[in-house]
């Protein structure tokens, strides 16, 4: 899940079909998600604690053919320190960097992808260090050794002038 400005949130629907769904307050409009457009670190999400809130689906993005082939399911979402949206697929054992999502829904497209290789568990959670290294949480039989810190960084912070090849 990714928090968006205005009390909106973006969730990944894992399968049948895999999709991204934006939820927000009733009568609000869908927002586009561009690089740097998620709720900033430390910024308050404008939803008050202790109150019941109603959210409605505002937009749906389905994967294009390349993204669907690269990521067989959508396990987790995260915003990298570069401001881009990233997706983790457990079935494909892949991290994908996604293109901007247009307002109102439509198609989600792949910008880049990284295969995770053999891991000692099922990749279910995604986070990033401030340097852009991916941390993958594994669903394992035992509750230890279930985090993997990947090298090299896949999401270098903005302003560093680095590019991925």
Annotate the PLM regions.
Residues 1-165:
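Sequence/structural signature of beta-propeller domains
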